[in-house]
Amino acid sequence: MKKSFNVDSTFNDMRIDRWIRNNLGNYPQGLIEKSLKSGKVKINNKKVKSSQKVKTGDIIDLFNFDFKETIVQKTIKFVPSEEVIKENEDLIIDNNEDFIVLNKSSGISVQGGTKSKKNLVDIFARSDIFQDTKPFSVHRLDKDTSGVFIMAKHREAAQLLTSLFRLRKVHKTYLAICHGELQKDVGEWNDDLTRYDNDKEIVEKARTTYKVLDKNSICSLIEMKPITGRKHQLRKQLYAVGSPIYGDQKYKFSNTDKAINKNLMLHSYQIKFMIKDKKHTYTALLPDYFKKLLKTKRLRFPSS
């Protein structure tokens, strides 16, 4: 019996033994080592050691591995209606033989999980666009963040795009409406961001360049270009300088007005990269709620 899994961006750079425990169950290290050595567990059809790190787009094959089916299926599968499929297909910016690019809506996850049901992977898995294949998630975009998002159509494209993101050859531009004013209109943030993995504290370097596009005494419109790709990087960095993003319910001050807007005012505005000497540039139009808050706060976006 063979069972295959596609590694999504959530587990990028995670050791294979930890991936197994996270996705298949809390197996003893000895059993995992034995299964890897015997070839019952392979990555991209190759035997690997337990220290091998998986990458987004990798295919993990289990051959007669005694996994617990109930644990494997802990992620809730979302079955979209035809209306939901059509709504998301209408958000597509580009559709070619290797990948699609869409303007993701706020409030929808990239992939399913124990906390998320409605997600893009399950939606497009049932779209005619992926009739002869399946969607591959190649990078992260928070559930509440809108904007440019890419999904590969086949394994080779997934591996290529993932490597471009990992090698920082994809140039991303984000827009955010944040509270208050920054000290400098142009600059770079270099921070040590802390996250926790199974109660273990992990500190990671985070770099972002930024430019203030417009501001007043109450709020600012910021353009940000992350150099590193840490979880919640932009949200954490703006919070750290005292200017949390409007609508951020996690990184905020206690006196933040919840009634101002329920949407996170963070938008993946543009992505640029090169494939075989061809330049790809994709821009996602601002959501209506973002433009509405700009108008309410009397902020001007140069391209709007």
Each predicted region: which residue ranges?
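Pseudouridine synthase
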Residues: 116-124, 155, 218-273
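RNA pseudouridine synthases
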Residues: 1-188, 192-198, 204, 215, ...
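PP2C/PPM family metal-dependent serine/threonine protein phosphatase catalytic domain
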Residues: 198-206, 250-253
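Short, solvent-exposed loop/turn motifs
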Residues: 47, 231, 279-281
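Short hairpin/turn module used for nucleic-acid contact or packing/dimerization
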Residues: 279-304
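Long C-terminal interaction/binding lobes of large macromolecular proteins
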Residues: 210
